[in-house]
Curated annotation (Swiss-Prot):
It catalyses: (1S,2R)-1-C-(indol-3-yl)glycerol 3-phosphate + L-serine = D-glyceraldehyde 3-phosphate + L-tryptophan + H2O. SUPFAM superfamilies: Tryptophan synthase beta subunit-like PLP-dependent enzymes. GO terms for molecular function: tryptophan synthase activity. The modification N6-(pyridoxal phosphate)lysine is found at residue 99. The lineage of its organism: Bacteria, Pseudomonadati, Pseudomonadota, Gammaproteobacteria, Pseudomonadales. It comes from Pseudomonas fluorescens (strain Pf0-1). This is Tryptophan synthase beta chain.
């Protein structure tokens, strides 16, 4: 299998206007445009600053605990009876997910820009926890917007955020999920542009956020290249990751986009099934439109109104997807599939029993796709799955589903 070529066309985006093909851009209120342009300038300067890079590397290593292990899942591999399965163990990071990679990068940028107040949106609560964590570490005020539906199903994370000193503001609008939390955070930002830094948690939002979040998450894929090279002496044959907004996936995928031999698979949340309309699969069941400052694939009705997304996993419950994913779907470089709630739950249980690892329900969607594909593949096929987070936060949800299914059987 060939190593990366010098041709990095697919990794060069976005263009100066923040576009990946026809996706992305900057669709923001006039009051925000100067701030967005300033943020883009500051980020470009930080990327070239050796002191910034050195400080980021220090915190990734000594605070986050990187590199995260690339673990050969021997029992999952035996169970599937085909491809050799490796897990990229992002759940072992400080705070229990990949989210901290991006938060450390952005908090250093916020400090560089002299901002004293941090705001963020959160769905599953993991980005909220990671944001509250870095705000505490750097002594900055922190406000987290979270939908009431998500607050109900992620109470442990709400408590963790408060413990870390953040103010958690419940959002009752809409379905009380991630989309609504992001709407409120954007409103706050417009009102408090001078003092406030909006720490977006995924590869969405107006430019430069999709590229910036991707760059901070790309440490996942860079480490995976080196680790698999050390363990197997070659590149993976396929990569698999779950997708909500898509930051954990983009972090794994981006360093491999120009390696044509590497098959890349993104897994959306099919909820109750795409055909039911109760899902969060923007690429498999959506159309292009504009939301939260960028053009991408969205779940919307014939009038262009955003349709409520559904997933058992709070972190995948978003009616859009990062614009770079939309572009990669459009050009056919990445395959985007989907997995139902039930399939994800089954994979969650298998991973617990076979590997002694409790994955997040988000990551369980990626595992479910692996369970479909791995048995059909040869034993020398190397498959890397991004285990994006741990499942502690999902105990209530899983218990509820186990109790419900017991009742249905009786």
């Amino acid at each position: 299998m060939t190593q990366t070529s010098n041709n990095s066309d697919l990794r060069n985006g976005p263009d100066a206007n923040g576009l990946f093909g026809s996706f992305g851009g900057r669709y923001v209120a006039e009051t925000l445009m100067p701030l967005i342009l300033d943020l883009a300038r500051e980020y470009e300067a930080a990327k070239e600053d050796p002191a910034f890079k050195e400080e980021l590397a220090y915190f990734q290593r000594d605070y986050v605990g990187r590199p995260s292990p690339l673990y050969f899942a021997e029992r999952l591999t035996e169970f599937c009876g085909g491809a050799k399965i490796y897990l990229k163990r992002e759940e072992l990071n400080h705070t229990g997910a990949h989210k901290i990679n991006n938060c450390i990068g952005q908090i250093l940028l916020a400090r560089r820009m002299g901002k004293k107040r941090i705001i963020a949106e959160t769905g599953a609560g993991m980005h909220g926890v990671a944001t509250a964590t870095v705000a505490a570490r750097f002594g900055l005020d922190c406000v987290i917007y979270m939908g009431t539906t998500d607050i109900e199903r992620q109470q442990a994370n709400v408590f963790r955020m408060k413990l870390l000193g953040a103010e958690v503001i419940p959002v009752v609008a809409g379905t009380g999920t991630l989309k609504d939390a992001m709407n409120e955070a954007l409103r706050d930002w417009v009102t408090n542009v001078d003092s406030t830094f909006y720490l977006i948690g995924t590869v969405a939002g107006p430019h430069p956020y999709p590229a910036m979040v991707r760059d901070f998450q790309a440490v996942i894929g860079k480490e995976t290249r080196d680790q698999l090279q050390a363990q197997e002496g070659r590149l993976p044959d396929s990569l698999v990751a779950c997708i909500g907004g898509g930051s954990n996936a983009m972090g794994l995928f981006h360093p491999f986009l120009d390696d044509k031999s590497v098959e890349i698979i993104g897994v959306e949340a099919a909820g109750y099934g795409i055909e039911t309309g109760k899902h969060a699969a923007s690429l498999n069941g959506g159309v292009p439109g504009v939301l939260h400052g960028n053009r991408t694939f969205l779940l919307q009705d014939d009038d262009g109104q955003i349709i409520d997304a559904h997933s058992i996993s709070a972190g995948l419950d978003y009616p859009g997807i990062g614009p770079e994913h939309a572009w990669l779907h459009d050009i056919g470089r990445v395959q985007y599939t989907s997995v139902t709630d039930d399939e994800a739950l089954a994979a969650f249980h298998q991973c617990c029993r076979l590997e002694g690892i409790i994955p997040a329900l988000e990551s369980a969607h990626a595992l479910a796709e692996v369970f479909k594909r791995a048995p059909k593949l040869p034993k020398d096929h190397l498959m890397v799955v991004n285990l994006s987070g741990r499942g502690d936060k999902d105990m209530q949800t899983v218990m509820h589903h186990m109790e419900t299914s017991k009742q249905e059987k009786h």
